[in-house]
Amino acid sequence: MANGTELRGIALEILLEITQEKEYSHLAIRNALNKVQYLPKQDRAFINRLVEGTLEYMLRIDYILNQFSSVRVNKMKPVIRNILRSGVYQLMFMDSVPDSAACNEAVKLAQKKGFYS
């Protein structure tokens, strides 16, 4: 079983491919999940749900982020923008993920990507 940061990192890479590289979501998800067949089915399902849910609610999530951030979503670095989007999705729509875990893993992922507070 992979750790939460690894799973969210895979989801982040998929989100970046879709939002930055303009890859079709179903193709990006399928290609990424094919590369991680070694992960348990439950972990791959988590990645899929996180990506699809973040994309489905992206407009709503961006609206929320704009209400609370001093930096507009469209001005954020793509990595940070997508970490925040997936974090907010987990907080709002994934009841199986504790709020503390969603926040902690978002911070860990940002640090792993080279962003420090």
Indicate residue ranges for each PLM-predicted region.
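Class I Rossmann-like S-adenosyl-L-methionine
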Residues: 1-117
